[in-house]
Amino acid sequence: MKNIHCINHPLIEHKLGILRAKETKPFQFRMLIDEISSFLLFEASKDFSLKEIEISTLIQKTTVKKLDEKIMICPILRAALGMLESVFKMIPDASVGFLGFVRNEETLKADFYFQKLPKDAKKRTAIVIDPMFATGGTAIEACNFLKSQGVKKIKFISILAAPQGLKKFSQMHDDVEVFVACIDEGLNEKGYIIPGLGDAGDRVFNTL
């Protein structure tokens, strides 16, 4: 799966260990999600195009580089809201396009219930964020929708992923690069990532 990138780094592995622990408090969990998301965005943005512009320093004029892509961050509600701030800090001029999905606990399929994209979405590179990439259903439907709206370039960032979901996703969207901090063992009978870290949304918003 050439479109799947698992980012190996000692600091990511250290932070993931704390993130997984059930004793980790919500405020610390949010901080770790923020930090790991920044690492992943750094990797996902390596091929962003640049343009040269002229500026004046305090000493003289010089040529510097500036991002030449319009970016749209697409958090999948609600858990991805914990990742949004870190991406915004790195790309403050980005727009945000919200995508709302809720998982049907019986079928394990993602039901699409809300979307709010910027008017120029088709002209932007979409960075979809969702901390958990489990069955792949939500990711597939999110990319299906974005492509139906004319979005040409999509990247996906998740903290944890299951191999089953990544394989299924790659079969449907091999043109979408996925950046994850760790690929876990798999899924349990309820479709949750194992060993995982629990429900990311509940841990971010302290609703356990």
Curated annotation (Swiss-Prot):
GO BP, sorted A to Z: UMP salvage; uracil salvage
EC class: transferase
MF terms (GO), sorted A to Z: GTP binding; magnesium ion binding; uracil phosphoribosyltransferase activity
Alphabetical UniProt keywords: Allosteric enzyme, Glycosyltransferase, GTP-binding, Magnesium, Nucleotide-binding, Transferase
Family annotation (CDD domains): PRTases_typeI
Cofactor(s) this protein cannot do without: Mg(2+)
Activity regulation statement: Allosterically activated by GTP.
Binding annotation for uracil: I193, G198, D199, A200
Cofactor info, note text: Binds 1 Mg(2+) ion per subunit. The magnesium is bound as Mg-PRPP.
InterPro entries: PRibTrfase_dom, PRTase-like, Upp_B, UPRTase/APRTase, Ura_phspho_trans
Superkingdom to which the source organism belongs: Bacteria
Pathway the protein contributes to: Pyrimidine metabolism; UMP biosynthesis via salvage pathway; UMP from uracil: step 1/1
Known catalytic reactions: UMP + diphosphate = 5-phospho-alpha-D-ribose 1-diphosphate + uracil
EC code(s) of this entry: 2.4.2.9
Binding positions (5-phospho-alpha-D-ribose 1-diphosphate): R78, R103, D130, P131, M132, F133, A134, T135, G136, G137, T138, D199
Role, per record: Catalyzes the conversion of uracil and 5-phospho-alpha-D-ribose 1-diphosphate (PRPP) to UMP and diphosphate.
Family as reported in the entry's similarity comment: Belongs to the UPRTase family.
Protein known as: Uracil phosphoribosyltransferase
Gene: upp
